[in-house]
Amino acid sequence: VMPGLIDTHLHFSGNLTDDDNDWVIESVAQKQACAVKQSYDCLTHGLTTVCEIGRNGIAIRDLVNMGVMKGPRIYATGLGFCRTAGHGDSHHLPLQVSKDSHPWGDQVDGPWELRHAVRLRLRENPDAIKIWATGGGIWRWDSGCKQLMSTEEIKAVADECKITGIPLWSHSYNSVSAAYDSVRFGAEQLIHGFELDDKTMEL
């Protein structure tokens, strides 16, 4: 017997292949069906609590809570915010296709646009707001070692989160500056966080 496990970063999003184009152009029905199975698989493999970033997580959370389906306890963000040509943007596809169907990324640029996007996301009743402060290394201009969201953009999202009291989760891969900006403006969770300096740790 062992206690239930916690996974603080996953995506219920389909992804039957490792091709980021397939992730986007697969049908909505496939995304949803795979997401339901992925949620159930988490529970049967010992994960009793998960933090989910994706298009279907909020709906699955609600269905689990209502007893309609079985799954773990889910803390869901809905789609996370990245910059255009960032980690949540499949660059081989037309931008509108990515905006309409990306499984976990919403492409938003600029502080005021991000403020509005946070307010729109709040209408979906998420448990947290997710940003990609860095890339993830999927393609040439998606470096996980560079801060891809500006200081002003990170602060704008953090300020909006503080207004309502919703937690901010920040994807910060291998960038000291992205981690520092995220934490100093109020991010409660750093996702990955492989590169941290002393001043960030002190915060």
Per-region residue spans from a language model:
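Extended, non-globular alpha-helical segments
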Residues: 113-127, 131-132
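Divalent metal-dependent hydrolysis catalytic cores, especially in the metallo-beta-lactamase
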Residues: 32-60, 71-80, 126-139, 166-167, ...
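Active-site core of metal-dependent hydrolases
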Residues: 132-203
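Mid-domain alpha/beta scaffold segments of enzyme catalytic cores
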Residues: 53-98, 104-108
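Active-site glycine- and acidic-residue-rich loops that bind
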Residues: 54-56, 105-119, 188-198
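Active-site mouth loops of central-metabolism enzymes
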Residues: 20-33, 92-117, 167-172
